[in-house]
């Protein structure tokens, strides 16, 4: 989710009830998140309470820089690394989703000590046979890298003698479900229910489609 905060947000916002000041900009942002964010119930977030808490920090003289920090702090309460607030001078980002945890992965260590700097790479996937005809290794650093069926054909042809497979997704920040499905489908030979998708269908916090 990307939200843009500008000094005159209401000039391009179709809701006339928002005043063109710090309060109006804050209220517009709060409403957008209230109507479109999906995980309030899952996370147990009282968005009304969060809104009151941060709105109370606004004063008539609050400038755009101060307002940005207030709004960014409110969005941080979602604890969601996919939610950003973007302006012409800054972009907020919830860093604690990774900064609060120890860094336990070093790509250089893998490349040097496990792969001996000798490996293949395609579609963002690093791959190699570890141990003679024994363990296949694939490192997929981001689900945003598009995987081609032909690329997978080559990788799996090279690793076809492997008795086991390591699919390393450490430090992967996420991406597209389609890429995950393309990869995982190569290791499943029957129909499997791996999850469900729900779509937001209305402005209410619990307005979702049926799972499919």
Regions found by a protein language model. Give the residues of each.
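Sec-dependent bacterial lipoprotein signal peptides
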Residues: 1-11
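Flexible, low-complexity junctional segments that flank or bridge functional domains
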Residues: 11-212
């Amino acid at each position: 989710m990307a939200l843009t905060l500008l000094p005159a947000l209401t000039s391009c916002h179709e809701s006339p009830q928002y005043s063109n000041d710090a309060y109006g900009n804050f209220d517009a942002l709060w409403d957008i998140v209230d109507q479109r964010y999906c995980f309030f119930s899952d996370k147990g977030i009282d968005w009304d309470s969060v809104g009151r808490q941060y709105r109370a920090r606004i004063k008539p003289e609050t400038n755009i820089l101060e307002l940005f920090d207030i709004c960014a702090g409110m969005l941080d309460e979602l604890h969601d690394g996919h939610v950003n607030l973007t302006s012409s001078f800054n972009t907020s980002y919830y860093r604690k989703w990774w900064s609060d945890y120890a860094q336990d992965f070093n790509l250089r260590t893998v490349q040097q000590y496990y792969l001996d700097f000798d490996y293949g790479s395609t579609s963002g996937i690093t791959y190699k046979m570890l141990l003679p005809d024994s363990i296949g290794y694939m490192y997929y650093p981001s689900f945003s890298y598009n995987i081609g069926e032909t690329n997978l054909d080559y990788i799996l042809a090279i690793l076809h003698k492997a008795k086991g497979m390591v699919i390393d997704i450490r430090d992967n920040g996420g991406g597209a479900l389609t890429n995950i499905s393309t990869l995982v489908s190569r290791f499943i030979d029957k129909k499997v229910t791996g999850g469900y998708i729900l779509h937001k269908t209305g402005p209410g916090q619990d307005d979702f489609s049926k799972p499919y």
